């Protein structure tokens, strides 16, 4: 009898510790599974997102660049503030500029970009749905040099990028 009560107590402690350890493992695995589901959703959205540059233009001053992109993917693009526009261009004195251009929803200022005209914008106004085109209006300072070859890289919030070359003003 004197060994029975301590043995029962030890057995109960072992059972409780086994239950708590198993519970901790299950909770950890559940967290990992939820993160994997979230990651799979994000990767799926990234795989279904695609942009195609259909045109570029620059005004005579070299300050205003227009890039037209077509949503050739299967998901919409709507979070413009989370998009990246990076320019690599030469100015009038042949100095190379590598510039990240932030989005603005207000008036276009120097070294900012905004959305312009949407083409085939049937559903969801001002959201770039599949099959629709949008103008990206960019203003830079210093201005793009005449007769230079320059590059623009556009990245969506889902991590998909497209790049294009554009010429400076004639």
Regions found by a protein language model. Name each.
Residues 1-54:
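Membrane engagement elements in two modes
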Residues 30-31, 139-170:
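Terminal connector regions
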Residues 60-66, 146-150:
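Short, solvent-exposed loop/turn segments enriched in Ser/Thr/Gly
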Residues 61, 129-130:
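Surface-exposed loops/turns
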Residues 68-74:
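Asparagine-centered strand-capping/turn motif at beta-strand->loop junctions
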Residues 74-79, 144-146:
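A short beta-turn/strand-edge loop motif at beta-sheet boundaries
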Residues 76-128:
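The feature marks short-to-medium sequence segments in extracytoplasmic or secretory-pathway proteins
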Residues 124, 132-138:
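Short strand-edge motifs at loop-to-beta-strand transitions and within beta-strands
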